[in-house]
């Protein structure tokens, strides 16, 4: 699709938006129900596409993508009428002849740019929120996950007219063309570098943006932690989707007094969860492409590897890898890993560690394994991060009841559930003056 085609599509959507069709709540509900039915009908095809793009098992595809999308639709269908209501708010005494109201309204034509690592979930979740809020949407999925992108395009055509929702496929040229256009809102999920470009381009039209980015998310294991529990949940969160998860624990900070015992548990858990030959395990996925395969492989210092480290270039698989005696100066600590490599650093002072974490770019997530409630409150209150867990990893994003989003370098804005509806809504304020009663002369 060239620049002219994209421009015409946007104008067609804008005309449809100003026809006021999307303001009808019942039509939004009908659209979401139609999408839900389509997803349920295509569950097998979704799993096949995700396996082709990322090597995901059927269980992982449903648990981490399809099931979460269906949950978000169900949540929105349950609450959309309440979210859409006009709300009366307090009016100050100085305006006692008036009444004040707020009411959410859609922005208009929205651009959603989604990534390749969870291509179905991260395309459909923001789409659901945008539709629920009454917007029209142009969805641009990643070219790196072509099978899933092609299926999404097919499903969207079945469910919606292009005036309401349309998919633009392609690569960098299409991304560039889209960002030259005037949208009413842009929602981007991806890397920090591209996020900066999205923000720069959006500023030309003063278009509001949500940026869901990433970063190096720390995971702290203190001396009081249940090490077996910590190892099991860290291994799950770190190596899920071959580490290609924006909120995966990027590196481990383990108290020096328990590090050896913790690493012993980590090795056991990798074998338990992925078998003795993870490169041939059906429960272990693959790296998205050769570019990222070589980038991740280049981060591994084989002199510091204590587990894993092998790979298969033909299948784009890298073993779950653990590196010990890592320092903050090592290559693996200079960028977000986004792969199955776990660097382990040690610490002795929690206060010093908090200072170190806060001196680095703000991460999307933070995890802390501890039995010390005082320490847990200290870390969550003093560290700057998007979201996280105490004694678990990654599951904080798998709910419609809490907003999910970054902070600082890891992004801005949030979504899921009510926060997703708010993200794609402009809240209009109205003050209605009530005429004074006629006074007797």
Which residue ranges define each predicted feature?
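Residues at or immediately preceding the N-termini of alpha-helices
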Residues: 6, 25, 43, 227, ...
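Residue-level signal for inorganic ion chemistry
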Residues: 28, 73, 134, 165, ...
């Amino acid at each position: 699709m060239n620049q002219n085609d994209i421009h015409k599509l946007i104008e067609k959507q804008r005309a449809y938006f100003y026809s006021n069709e999307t303001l009808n709540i019942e039509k939004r509900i009908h659209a979401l129900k139609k999408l839900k039915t389509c997803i349920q009908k295509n569950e097998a095809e979704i799993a096949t596409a995700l396996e082709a793009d990322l090597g995901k098992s059927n269980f992982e595809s449903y648990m981490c993508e399809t099931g979460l999308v269906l949950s978000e639709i169900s949540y929105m269908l349950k609450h959309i009428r309440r979210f859409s209501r006009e709300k009366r708010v307090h009016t100050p005494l100085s305006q006692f002849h008036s009444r004040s109201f707020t009411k959410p309204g859609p922005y208009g034509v929205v651009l959603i740019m989604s990534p390749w690592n969870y291509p179905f979930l991260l395309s459909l979740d923001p789409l659901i929120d945008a539709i629920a809020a009454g917007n029209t949407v142009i969805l641009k999925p990643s070219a790196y996950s072509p099978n899933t992108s092609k299926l999404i395009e097919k499903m969207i055509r079945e469910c919606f007219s292009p005036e309401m929702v349309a998919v633009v496929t392609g690569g960098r040229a299409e991304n560039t063309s889209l960002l030259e256009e005037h949208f009413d809102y842009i929602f981007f999920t991806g890397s920090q570098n591209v996020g900066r470009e999205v923000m720069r381009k959006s500023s030309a039209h003063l278009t509001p943006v949500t940026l869901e980015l990433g970063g190096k998310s720390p995971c702290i294991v203190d001396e009081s932690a249940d090490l077996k529990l910590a190892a099991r949940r860290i291994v799950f969160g770190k190596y899920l989707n071959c580490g290609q998860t924006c909120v995966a624990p990027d590196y481990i900070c383990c108290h020096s007094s328990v590090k050896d015992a913790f690493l012993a548990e980590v090795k056991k858990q990798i074998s338990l969860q992925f078998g003795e030959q993870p490169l041939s395990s059906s429960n272990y996925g693959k790296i998205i492409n050769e570019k990222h395969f070589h980038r991740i492989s280049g981060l591994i210092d084989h002199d510091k590897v204590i587990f894993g480290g092998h790979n298969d270039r033909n299948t784009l698989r890298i073993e779950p890898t653990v590196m010990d005696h890592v320092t903050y100066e090592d290559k693996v600590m200079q960028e977000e890993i986004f792969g199955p490599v776990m660097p382990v650093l040690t610490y002795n002072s929690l206060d010093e560690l908090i200072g170190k974490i806060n001196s680095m770019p703000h991460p999307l997530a933070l995890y802390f394994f501890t039995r010390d409630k005082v320490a847990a409150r200290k870390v969550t209150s003093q560290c700057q991060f998007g979201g996280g867990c105490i004694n678990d990893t990654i599951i904080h994003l798998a709910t419609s009841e809490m907003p999910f989003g970054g902070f600082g370098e890891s992004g801005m804005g949030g979504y899921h559930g009510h926060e997703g509806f708010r993200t794609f809504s402009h809240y209009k304020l109205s003050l209605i003056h009530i005429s004074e009663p006629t006074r007797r002369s």
